Amino acid sequence: MTSSRLSLAADARDSILSHAREGAAGDPPAEVCGVLAGDSDARTVTAAHPVSNVAAEPRVAYELDPEETVSILEAIESAGDDAVGFYHSHPESDPVPSATDRERASWPGYVYLICSPDGRMTAHEWTGDEFRELSVAVE
């Protein structure tokens, strides 16, 4: 992946934000997460697939449920699409990579989209050493 831009389908954006708002409305608020599907070469996201957050501290961290993630990745591949990356929310902080996000990032070349319940979102490619910010275009 070489583009510095992520194209995000409006339906996928709406799904991600709805999921983030559900997590933020919890008591206590919790980060939500999921898998982004589409065309990895074009860096285009056409669908967002929610995955349960199984982190020990879901208010400040996320961990994709491994079994759900494998099932979703298989379904994406079966549909002829690619896993473009992952999304998660920051219900009580800005949508930028946290120290925890940096420590736990483990998929070089994939997109990590972070959103807040107020609709702000950022996207970053994990290089294996750092996050490289991407512009986000909703289409």
Swiss-Prot record:
The record marks S98 as: Transition state stabilizer. Zn(2+) binds at H88, H90, D101. One of its GO terms (molecular function) is metalloexopeptidase activity. This is Desampylase. Changing D101E: Loss of catalytic activity. InterPro entries: JAB_dom_prok, JAMM/MPN+_dom, Metalloprotease_DSAMP, MPN, VirAsm_ModProt. Changing D94N: Retains desampylating activity. Metalloprotease that displays desampylase (DSAMP) activity, cleaving ubiquitin-like small archaeal modifier proteins (SAMP1, SAMP2 and SAMP3) from protein conjugates (isopeptide- and linear-linked). Thus, likely regulates sampylation and the pools of 'free' SAMP available for protein modification. Functions as a specific and not a general protease since it is unable to hydrolyze a variety of unmodified proteins otherwise hydrolyzed by proteinase K. Inhibited by EDTA and N-ethylmaleimide (NEM) in vitro. Pfam families: Prok-JAB (PF14464). Gene3D superfamilies: Cytidine Deaminase, domain 2. Optimum pH is 7-10. Displays little to no activity at low pH (pH 6.5 and below). Its EC number is 3.4.19.15. A motif (JAMM motif) lies at residues 88-101. The keyword Protease applies. Binds 1 zinc ion per subunit. Belongs to the peptidase M67B family.
